[in-house]
């Protein structure tokens, strides 16, 4: 098993508490509205807390796929949320899981700084490859931007 770890940081004008609410507390309804590729988010096991598994159905390259998203930890007081992609058609065959450790911080002018550590764990002797890391980062950046744009466009939220 190989492990490829990288970190990323994004900034936004959206306040941390509001962004956290959209990304964690209301994610099941907000994400399909904000992220065009994601069609639905549904709980398949658990009560919404750590250990819960969610199925995200998405369209990628004209194909309907899904990934299984497992909640690892929720730290509302510190605006932290950890989860892993643990299965599904959207997970490459060589990947065991992709883990995300996320945290929001107060940014400039009332905005937010989002920090994430991503760990890609491969199966067997497969080696993590840089392209998978770049693709994961690009998807994460696009996801964050889509949520930001949704919140800016919906100030009543």
From Swiss-Prot:
The gene is PR10.2F. Trans-zeatin 3 binds at residues 69, 81. It comes from the Eukaryota. GO terms for molecular function: abscisic acid binding; calcium ion binding; cytokinin binding; melatonin binding; protein phosphatase inhibitor activity; RNA nuclease activity; signaling receptor activity. GO terms for cellular component: cytosol; nucleus. Gene3D superfamilies: 3.30.530.20. Class II ribonuclease (RNase). Binds to cytokinins. Interacts with melatonin. Belongs to the BetVI family. Trans-zeatin 1 binds at residues 8, 83. The keyword Chaperone does not apply. This is Class 10 plant pathogenesis-related protein 2F. Its EC number is 3.1.27.-. Its main location: cytoplasm. Pfam families: Bet_v_1. Ca(2+) binds at residues 32, 35, 38. Keywords: Allergen, Calcium, Cytoplasm, Hydrolase, Metal-binding, Nuclease, Pathogenesis-related protein, Plant defense. CDD domains: Bet_v1-like (cd07816). It is found in: Cytoplasm, Cytosol. GO terms for biological process: abscisic acid-activated signaling pathway; defense response. Trans-zeatin 2 binds at residue 60.
């Amino acid at each position: 098993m190989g492990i490829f770890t990288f970190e990323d940081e994004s900034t936004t004008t959206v306040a941390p508490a509001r962004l956290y609410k959209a990304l964690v507390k209301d994610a099941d309804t907000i994400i399909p509205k904000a992220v065009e590729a994601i069609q639905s988010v549904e709980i398949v096991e658990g009560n919404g807390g750590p250990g819960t598994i969610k199925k995200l159905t998405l369209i990628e390259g004209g194909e309907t796929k899904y990934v299984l998203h497992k909640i690892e930890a929720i730290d509302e007081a510190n605006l932290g949320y950890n989860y892993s992609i643990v299965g599904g058609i959207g997970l490459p065959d060589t990947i065991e899981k992709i883990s995300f450790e996320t945290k929001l911080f107060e940014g400039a002018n009332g905005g937010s700084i989002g920090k994430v550590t991503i760990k890609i764990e491969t199966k067997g002797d497969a080696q993590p490859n840089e392209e998978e890391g770049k693709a994961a980062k690009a998807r994460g950046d696009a996801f964050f931007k889509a949520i930001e744009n949704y919140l800016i466009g919906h100030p009543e939220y």
